[in-house]
Design a protein with these regions (language model features):
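Basic/polar, acidic-poor N-terminal "presequence/leader" segments
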Residues: 99-106
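Long amphipathic alpha-helical segments that form oligomerization/scaffold cores
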Residues: 123-139
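Acidic, His- and aromatic-enriched active-site or binding-groove loops in soluble protein domains
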Residues: 109-111
């Protein structure tokens, strides 16, 4: 095909110079597109999705890292949706939502330091918590299963040490508990973890229960039956020389976890017991002391 401009002795540039319509079209095409700032929530959304989908290499690490990653992502989403006034909403034990998040960040810090995570430097409480939790997850996910057996200090009023594996379950537990605290303080509905994660949290708490009982240890065992999502049956020796099962205690699994978190007064906690009623009460009261609040 012969170019009509050339066939009339004119180049395209000559035509554009003489034609106002073409000159305007070329100017529009040559104009650079203005740079657009990404939406403010984009970074948080991408990070939350990445944390949910992160798959640590070692199967044993997945078991404890994935539940924590899920609760971190849910907490991150929750905090991203708070406006200024909601950060000052009152919260029992910690004053405000902001104070509660600072408490959680401080409890997470012991495990983060153990894992070699750098100190968080974010400008806001949300940013500092998120940076630290993300760094902790990255290091745990890249670590080996052997590391999970190393003893570390647990959070809480009672001094206790446990393998890193259990400390990470506690991080999952406390993150969920405080997310529910924030939901309650800001008019949102509570949200329980997945059933398999509830089961893991309940098992973690029941392993600590004998140490939390007041008075001399008795040479008996207790069977605890937790019903509903995440439930199961555990028989717990209350001393190294435990003999027969002295009590069978039944309760709902998520309710039991909330009792352990200190979110259900032991005198009001719904449970059923067979055997020694006094021992059942002692177990419920001991469970209520295992939370992470100080």
């Amino acid at each position: 095909m012969t170019d009509p401009y050339l066939s009339h002795g004119r180049t395209p540039d000559d035509h554009v110079a003489a034609c106002p319509h073409c000159r305007a079209a070329v100017a529009l095409l040559d104009r650079p597109e203005p740079a657009l700032a990404p939406p403010p929530a984009l970074r948080g959304t991408v990070l939350s999705t990445a944390r949910r989908r992160r798959a640590p290499a070692a199967p044993g690490v997945v078991t404890v890292a994935a539940p924590y990653a899920e609760q971190v992502a849910l907490m991150d989403d929750l905090l991203a949706g708070l406006h200024g006034e909601q950060w000052r909403a009152p919260v029992d034990r910690h004053g405000t939502v902001e104070g509660l998040l600072e408490h959680l960040t401080a409890n997470d810090a012991a495990i983060a330091r153990f894992m070699g995570a750098p100190a968080a430097t974010g400008a806001s409480p949300h940013r500092r918590w998120r940076e630290q939790a993300g760094a902790l997850l990255e290091r745990v996910s890249a670590g080996s299963e052997v590391l999970l057996g190393v003893e570390v200090a647990l959070a809480g009023v009672r001094p206790a040490r446990a393998p890193l594996r259990q400390a990470l379950v506690q991080r999952t537990f406390e993150t969920w508990t405080h997310a529910d605290d924030i939901r309650a303080a800001t008019g949102r509905s509570r949200a329980a973890p997945r059933a398999v994660h509830v089961h893991q949290i309940a098992e973690f708490a029941l392993a600590l229960l004998p140490r939390a009982l007041k008075g001399p240890r008795r040479a008996v065992s207790a069977t605890v039956v937790l019903t509903g999502a995440g439930g199961g049956t555990w028989t717990i020796p209350l001393s190294p020389a435990s003999g027969h099962v002295a009590v069978l205690l039944s309760a709902e699994a998520v309710d039991f976890c909330r009792l352990v978190a200190g979110r259900w007064p032991p005198g009001e906690f719904p449970y059923a017991a067979e055997g020694e009623p006094g021992l059942a009460r002692d177990l419920v009261e001991a469970a209520a002391t295992l939370g992470c609040d100080r």
